[in-house]
């Protein structure tokens, strides 16, 4: 059995078309959705991510601006800039590209973003609200994964789900969203004693640790849905995920590729969150 491919590019295209329609409707009412992306330093990977986010905005009728600063920028100056963006009516979403230089406290910076403009969903107010099932914004990557389940009619209620990874960005919020959808969730991580014992019981596995081949074919239950959030390079320098794709696709029922799986969905859900922020602001105006 070869797994059905969950195509993140195709689903992203559909969702971005919907986002563009909502953006056009808002713009016609004088409320063009606006995203500010803040980049500190010259991390090449971060520059690519920021460029992709800005392009996605431009392609879909959003206003966007990039604030790029040298890595010598002080924490105080960055916090002052975020405060300005919090009060800028043209800006509905603020995204600070991580990682930040070592001298800047990323927690303090993320907490400085107004919760109603926290389109990454990382502010403690939104992270806490996720626990109660009522967040203003869901973090983009887990939100995108949930849309993939929905698009492919993958049943979550009563399913055994394993999330490999416990980061605040993917692992923990992913577990919360699966729990909210009625799955029985296990979070595995670097201290988990027997990872395979957990994954072999799972109907759904989400791998999000940034480690090649953390999940191999012998660790997967036949017919399981496998979501690969990882972004790594193989020995030849080619992009790959956390899952041994060639082996696992022969066992799983559904699987996401890398590239072309979860990656495109992350930026798409950033657009959706920004639209929702703009719609709330327009309703309150």
Curated annotation (Swiss-Prot):
Chain segments annotated as coiled-coil in the UniProt record: none
Top-level taxon: Bacteria
InterPro entries, per database record: Aminoacid_DH-like_N_sf, NAD(P)-bd_dom_sf, THF_DH/CycHdrlase, THF_DH/CycHdrlase_cat_dom, THF_DH/CycHdrlase_CS, THF_DH/CycHdrlase_NAD-bd_dom
Catalytic activity: (6R)-5,10-methylene-5,6,7,8-tetrahydrofolate + NADP(+) = (6R)-5,10-methenyltetrahydrofolate + NADPH; (6R)-5,10-methenyltetrahydrofolate + H2O = (6R)-10-formyltetrahydrofolate + H(+)
UniProt GO BP: L-histidine biosynthetic process; methionine biosynthetic process; purine nucleotide biosynthetic process; tetrahydrofolate interconversion
Recorded family membership: Belongs to the tetrahydrofolate dehydrogenase/cyclohydrolase family.
Name of the protein: Bifunctional protein FolD
Gene source species: Burkholderia ambifaria (strain MC40-6)
Taxonomic path: Bacteria, Pseudomonadati, Pseudomonadota, Betaproteobacteria, Burkholderiales
